């Protein structure tokens, strides 16, 4: 079954192998030896190439910033925009996050009865979990 997936590549690979055979039959080295080394550029050409690369990079960044400003800071590449493609889903997710944050905050003892509440809770714990040696549970 895997052969049918690669069947379009079969004629292409045959063509490539045929071309390689023709290239090996022709004198190949003499043509390359006459060319200068392509990796060595004159200093002026390398400076021009570097300047062109920097210019293109700056233009690309300017276009990206302009596009981001047009979309209001929420480009399609940002994770928030991908998650919030549907407005109701985005609002529901935001409310769920806020509700989760509200419930995970530690409770603080603020108010009129706060100091006494701790003492009452401590007495209840002592009474419920005190020593039960020789006494029944109903004695309390």
UniProtKB/Swiss-Prot annotation:
<keyword id="KW-0027">Amidation</keyword>
<dbReference type="InterPro" id="IPR021117">
    <property type="entry name" value="Calcitonin-like"/>
</dbReference>
<keyword id="KW-0732">Signal</keyword>
<dbReference type="GO" id="GO:0051480">
    <property type="term" value="P:regulation of cytosolic calcium ion concentration"/>
</dbReference>
<dbReference type="InterPro" id="IPR021116">
    <property type="entry name" value="Calcitonin/adrenomedullin"/>
</dbReference>
<dbReference type="InterPro" id="IPR001693">
    <property type="entry name" value="Calcitonin_peptide-like"/>
</dbReference>
<dbReference type="InterPro" id="IPR018360">
    <property type="entry name" value="Calcitonin_CS"/>
</dbReference>
<feature type="signal peptide">
    <location>
        <begin position="1"/>
        <end position="25"/>
    </location>
</feature>
<dbReference type="GO" id="GO:0005179">
    <property type="term" value="F:hormone activity"/>
</dbReference>
<keyword id="KW-0372">Hormone</keyword>
<feature type="modified residue" description="Proline amide">
    <location>
        <position position="115"/>
    </location>
</feature>
<dbReference type="GO" id="GO:0031716">
    <property type="term" value="F:calcitonin receptor binding"/>
</dbReference>
<feature type="propeptide">
    <location>
        <begin position="120"/>
        <end position="140"/>
    </location>
</feature>
<comment type="function">
    <text>Calcitonin is a peptide hormone that causes a rapid but short-lived drop in the level of calcium and phosphate in blood by promoting the incorporation of those ions in the bones. Calcitonin function is mediated by the calcitonin receptor/CALCR and the CALCR-RAMP2 (AMYR2) receptor complex.</text>
</comment>
<keyword id="KW-1015">Disulfide bond</keyword>
<dbReference type="Pfam" id="PF00214">
    <property type="entry name" value="Calc_CGRP_IAPP"/>
</dbReference>
<keyword id="KW-0964">Secreted</keyword>
<dbReference type="GO" id="GO:0005615">
    <property type="term" value="C:extracellular space"/>
</dbReference>
<feature type="disulfide bond">
    <location>
        <begin position="84"/>
        <end position="90"/>
    </location>
</feature>
<dbReference type="GO" id="GO:0007189">
    <property type="term" value="P:adenylate cyclase-activating G protein-coupled receptor signaling pathway"/>
</dbReference>
<comment type="similarity">
    <text>Belongs to the calcitonin family.</text>
</comment>
<feature type="propeptide">
    <location>
        <begin position="26"/>
        <end position="81"/>
    </location>
</feature>
<dbReference type="InterPro" id="IPR021118">
    <property type="entry name" value="Calcitonin"/>
</dbReference>
<protein>
    <recommendedName>
        <fullName>Calcitonin</fullName>
    </recommendedName>
</protein>
<keyword id="KW-0165">Cleavage on pair of basic residues</keyword>
């Amino acid at each position: 079954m895997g052969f049918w997936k690669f069947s379009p590549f079969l004629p292409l690979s045959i063509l490539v192998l045929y071309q390689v055979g023709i290239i090996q039959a022709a004198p190949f080295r003499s043509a390359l030896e006459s060319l200068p080394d392509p990796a060595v550029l004159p200093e002026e050409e390398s400076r021009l190439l570097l300047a062109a690369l920097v210019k293109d990079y700056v233009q690309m960044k300017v276009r990206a910033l302009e596009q981001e400003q047009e979309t209001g800071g929420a480009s399609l590449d940002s994770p928030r925009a991908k998650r919030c493609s549907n407005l109701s889903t985005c609002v529901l997710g935001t409310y769920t996050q806020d509700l989760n944050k509200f419930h995970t905050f530690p409770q603080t003892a603020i108010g009129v009865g706060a100091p006494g509440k701790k003492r009452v809770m401590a007495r209840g714990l002592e009474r419920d979990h005190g020593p039960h040696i020789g006494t029944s549970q109903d004695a309390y």
